[in-house]
Amino acid sequence: MSEEKTYPMTAEGRDKLQLELEDLIANQRPEITKRIQIARSYGDLSENSEYQSAKDEQAFVEGRIQTLKNMIDNAEIIDSNATAKDEVSLGKTVTFKELPNEEPETYAIVGSVEADPLAGKISNESPMANALIGKKVGETVAVPLPNGISIDVEIINVTK
């Protein structure tokens, strides 16, 4: 028997997924159902693009609902208090700089479900986060990049 996959995430990330799920169920699902009923009233379904479009959207929304339910049911909430205050871990925000003299960058380390690099959130599965997790402020870390080379970064700060 296979184990269910768990999804590491912050409580905030789980709450965002829950809100998305509630919106899909309460708003989008009924709206699509109405559109399907209206499109059916147009007659012949074989050449009814409105009907086909609504059915395609319904399939997408139903799939997303199932995915969200699975992720929420199997969420592993990250406890950033379980590690030392100055240690990089899931749920913490880390500031680092590429050596020798790049500008500091700050990212929150989150589960892959929440990752959004443009919003300053990187996945714990990314090469950068993977190299930083478990390290402490002041340490220099070699981060292997996908192209085979590595860069050295210095951890400047860690916060919750």
Curated annotation (Swiss-Prot):
Coiled-coil intervals: 49-77
PANTHER family per the UniProt record, alphabetical: TRANSCRIPTION ELONGATION FACTOR GREA (PTHR30437:SF4)
Job of this protein: Necessary for efficient RNA polymerase transcription elongation past template-encoded arresting sites. The arresting sites in DNA have the property of trapping a certain fraction of elongating RNA polymerases that pass through, resulting in locked ternary complexes. Cleavage of the nascent transcript by cleavage factors such as GreA or GreB allows the resumption of elongation from the new 3'terminus. GreA releases sequences of 2 to 3 nucleotides.
GO biological process: DNA-templated transcription elongation; regulation of DNA-templated transcription elongation
SUPFAM superfamilies the UniProt entry points to: FKBP-like, GreA transcript cleavage protein, N-terminal domain
UniProt cross-references to Pfam families, sorted A to Z: GreA_GreB (PF01272), GreA_GreB_N (PF03449)
Name under which the protein is recorded: Transcription elongation factor GreA
HAMAP family linked to this entry: GreA_GreB
NCBIfam families per UniProt: greA, PRK00226.1-2, PRK00226.1-4
Originating species: Leuconostoc mesenteroides subsp. mesenteroides (strain ATCC 8293 / DSM 20343 / BCRC 11652 / CCM 1803 / JCM 6124 / NCDO 523 / NBRC 100496 / NCIMB 8023 / NCTC 12954 / NRRL B-1118 / 37Y)
Family designation: Belongs to the GreA/GreB family.
Record bears the keyword DNA-binding: yes
Keywords: Coiled coil, DNA-binding, Transcription, Transcription regulation
Gene assigned in the entry: greA
GO MF annotation list: DNA binding; RNA polymerase binding
